[in-house]
Amino acid sequence: MSRGLGDVYKRQARQIVDSFPKDQQLIFGPDKNLGNYINSVTGRNMLLWNGACHVHEKFSVEKIIELKQQYPDAEILVHPECKGAVAKLADKIGSTAGLLNYAINSTSKNFIVATESGILYEMRRKCPDKNFIPAPPEDSTCACNECNFMRLNTLEKLYNTLKYEWPEVQVDAEIARQAIKPIRRMLELSK
């Protein structure tokens, strides 16, 4: 089966999975942690691709527990791509937008945030009276909660891509033909 036959975006993953009959076996990828989370909220037992986001894999359960002891009133916000042991500590599991909206509407003043650190700027901008503490990685010598791949995107690159329509991505005609149906179906299901 072509990879294009089953791709979904994170925020739509549960909605897409729920659209299939419960007795239909599904293969979920590329993120096993997101797949585990979807399994837990849907009661499914999907087969999971053994891939994961390097940022969400590196949060330390022990260090988050230590932070929680320092800030006992803090709520722990966790992205569903985090390991299951981290997710079990969560007061709220949600997408980037879901975590931001939760923080805006919460009466809590302190939050421990277990996701890519780029969200912290927006959280602090929208909630200047609240304290957002990045969840620590297992390795204290690195900036492991920053995604190097996301940092490759810049406004200048986006501008040039829109203006000059480059870089051009070439897709094999047969792959494009096979991919168009699930992409359209995914968009229909996510409305």
Question: Where do the protein language model's features map onto the residues?
Answer:
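Single conserved hydrophobic/aromatic residue that forms the stacking wall/gate
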Residues: 1-9
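Short beta->alpha connector loops at strand-helix junctions that form conserved
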Residues: 10, 48-52, 134-138
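Short, well-ordered alpha-helical microsegments
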Residues: 13-14, 34-36, 64, 86, ...
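Loop-centered beta-sheet repeat module
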Residues: 13-49
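Short, surface-exposed amphipathic charged segments that create phosphate/polyanion-binding patches used
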Residues: 19-25, 43, 61-67, 111, ...
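Short, solvent-exposed amphipathic alpha-helical segments in soluble enzyme
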Residues: 21-22, 39-45, 70, 91-93, ...
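Active-site rim loops that border cofactor/substrate pockets in soluble metabolic enzymes
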Residues: 49-112
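C-terminal functional extensions of proteins
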Residues: 80, 98, 106-108, 115-121, ...
